[in-house]
Amino acid sequence: RNAFRGDGKIFYKRKLPDDSMDIAIAILNDESGSMSSKQRITYARSASIILYDFCRSLNIPIAVYGHTECYDVDLFAYAEFDSVDGNDKFRMMDMSARDGNRDGAALRFVAERLMTRPEPCKLLFIISDGQPAGSGGYFGTAAEADLRGIKAEYERKGITLFAAAIGDDKPNIKRIYGDGFIDISDLSKLPTTLGKILIAKINQKYAA
């Protein structure tokens, strides 16, 4: 089968296995207000749709979520693993820059959803432009420590986390996510970069 480029076209040809991939994917999008800058939310939306299409074409279970916070954490389920109504991509078009971002609660929710999948390889992609900034003092070192703890907890449970940093807050995101940090300086390369990571994981699985 063919893998995709950032514009949705094929970026290289590679024969991929036709049987079950034993991989499940979840994407968590930051929908904080700062995502309106430099069309970040547009690129995040595009990357989510392209990855969604690619996974569906290979029968890889995928779920896509967004999150923000305005007093309470708001989570948006754009595509669920078992979604059958055919409207996932229409829902993803509603992805928007909104308010704050209390990342810990959202990340834990999506990780728990991913844990319900039977596939042994579980990948969670986070697309964000900055460090957490929520109400009730959820920011700075305390929030960073919370996220590092959540990352470590779910990696022990078998989830591999990647954080695509698409804003100016890259050092902080790298400090939080460590080896899962992905530096996206060119927003147009976001879909391609995430796609290549997914392809590498597929190839790694079948080379084992």
Describe each region flagged by the PLM.
Residues 1-208:
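Acidic, glycine-rich A-domain
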